[in-house]
Amino acid sequence: MTRKSSNRSRGRKARSGKSASSSKLQIWLGRIWSIGWKLALTLAAVLVFIGIYLDSMIKQRFEGQLFDLPTVVYARILTLEPGNGLSLQELRNELDVLNYRKVAQPRFPGEYASSSSRIELIRRPFEFADGPEPDRRVMLTFDGSGLNKIESLEQKRELGYLRLEPKLMGMLEKDSPEQRLFLRRDQFPEVLVDALLVTEDRDFYQHDGVSPLAIGRAMVVNLKAGRTVQGGSTLTQQLAKNIFLSSDRTLWRKLREAYMALIIDYRYSKDRILEAYLNEVYLGQSGADAIHGFGLASRLYFGQPLQELRIDQLALLVGMVKGPSYYNPMRYAERARERRDLVLKLMMEHDILTAPEYQQAVTRPLDVQKTAQIASRQPAYFQQVSIELKEKLGDKFKADSGLRVFTSLDPVSQSKLEQAIHDQIPQLAKTAGKDLEAAAIAVDRHSGEIRAMVGGKRTGYDGFNRVLNASRQIGSLVKPAVYLTALAHPDQYNLATTLEDKPLTLKGSEGSAWTPRNYDRQYRGEVPLYLALAQSLNVPTVALGMKLGIDQVSATLGKLGVNRDEIRPVPSMLLGSFSLTPYQVAQMYQTLTNSGKKAPLSALRSVLDLEGNVLYESLPRVSQAVDQQAAWLTTYAMKQGVQEGTGRYLNAQFSSAALAGKTGTTNDNRDSWFVGVDGREVTTIWLGRDDNQPTKLTGASGALRVYAQYLKYRIPEKLQLPWPEGITTFGFAKQTQGGLKLDCDNAFKLPIWDNQQQLKQQCENRPTEWIKKLFEW
């Protein structure tokens, strides 16, 4: 073969090899392309599927209830009206409880100025049950009788009334540990939003949920630092993570976070996203509760509504977003201050603050509360609220559905009652022993609304509530029911009726004998009915009760609100040998001292759902349970008990208040009771031991002392009892045997229900003085 033909042969082989290689490459590329586009299509389908799933999940949360919202509980709404007797000092106390700030000249909501006869204040805006009310600048003028004028300084006119916003009591316990106070977007101060964006997400209004610029900026900072010191997540990404994802540092979580942020940004407005973030962000702990949202964090750290915080305080909260535990101002004050000042500096650099404003803000102290708490704890009262919510709402009650509950709690009464127990129990325990316990409840005398409740000497302890659950013998607290039963028969009994105080022995059906004795072991021979009750004498009470009949007294107790199944019909029940809770005693005495009108005890006033719909509203349910005149006369005798009977310790300190009261002591001094009544409240106090051992305390030496301490803090309102129809005063002369005799002209007077006008006729038919002298001559 020639060289030329050989070369041609090699050329053909080379071309053939190249052609084969090219063909293989094309086949390989074709396969890659085929696999690639299939994979891409599959990936796209997966992404679409994931997107649809994530979109559905986001829509379900955002267009339903985005958060678990706690049931928010408020104290009573105080309505100020000229002529209602409210003193200037009492209003100051109310404003202090509501954390109003005393200043020289009010400029902002939540501030007031005070003089000797005036208070100028700017009432905070609040969304009441019947609608929202804006902030309002008013001048309140007082005279010797109390509040006499309310003037709107903006409208230059007098107002008939003014409502103060209620105190936030706290949130009811729920399954989730998250707690938040939801605010609408327009309720957040704009300077807070500006500070947050300049610190956490400067491109918020420009990006679509994910910010490549922020990611790049974070990468540069982290590379320079040699470690992760700055994240590139937008607020939208943080929101997606907080609501839907865990905090795991994985690529898969970051990808889902970014994808969800894009969907959220596409579906919802920037303001809607901001509202969600501002209410969702975690900002610390209060015990076991996780505090979410700026609204509740403001209450936790500063004890003030968010709208009233200074710029430096808002900056502190914004600074804590990066690490609430690390920058906790209550534990790491200097670290928190540095972070706050950094936020303030960023605000100045971005023209949110001027240089002078910045300088003023960085020089301010942190001004956080001494202890991190949302509100004062009233666990006993909260238990009552929970019970009533379940009773009134049934299946509608869900603790995480954002209900707003308005109660009748009086924050001044509550705090002063707690303070009285804190002060007195250590002193009384020196006599009774360290295991001495307490329970107390104060109710409105007319409406039956529960104004305060303390379940034990550890007032903030959420445990056994003795007001509701400690059923103890009531001792002499039963006696007014015995005398009420008698006074309901005015043709047979009145306050001047003579009762025998002589040795008495009662025989039982099985031959047993019971001999009641007075506490002092003395017998007085004869005693007027009113004094037997005032001095809480046992023997006359038992004698009277047996004459009336045990069933009759038991029926009276039933009318006053006592479950008759609790009462064993034996003679000793006339001295309180049966057991009631302080709650049941409070109901009994509310009815008695309200001229026989029973108003069921209640803590709820109204309940609103998240949209503001009224789910429950309390309506007056007062009924005449016992004769008005008989109840009034019994209460009068209880007033005498404070003046000259077992409650006279009170009269020495509060004589001008004309108080009524009743002591109660059980066998071996196991229980010490006192029920005190002023013009405002019926307050029931019990002292004893959970193991039912003796305390060495009587009602007068124990529970009454707690009540007296309470009145030192909570100035009593004078008890005025409007005279019912048919009650007339008559003169009586004291007899040597101890009883009373009608003496129409005598200076010593007693009110009498003279329904058949027997005493009136006796006085009208008596001989005149000159005729008597004539016969004497």
Swiss-Prot record:
A cellular component term (GO) from this record? peptidoglycan-based cell wall
**Pfam families, sorted:** Transgly (PF00912), Transpeptidase (PF00905), UB2H (PF14814)
- For this protein, what is the EC number? 2.4.99.28, 3.4.16.4
One Gene Ontology BP term is:
response to antibiotic
Q: How does it sit in the membrane?
A: Single-pass type II membrane protein
Q: Which residues lie on this side of the membrane: Periplasmic?
A: 53-777
Q: Which NCBIfam families match?
A: PBP_1a_fam (TIGR02074), PBP_1b (TIGR02071)
What is this protein's record name?
Penicillin-binding protein 1B
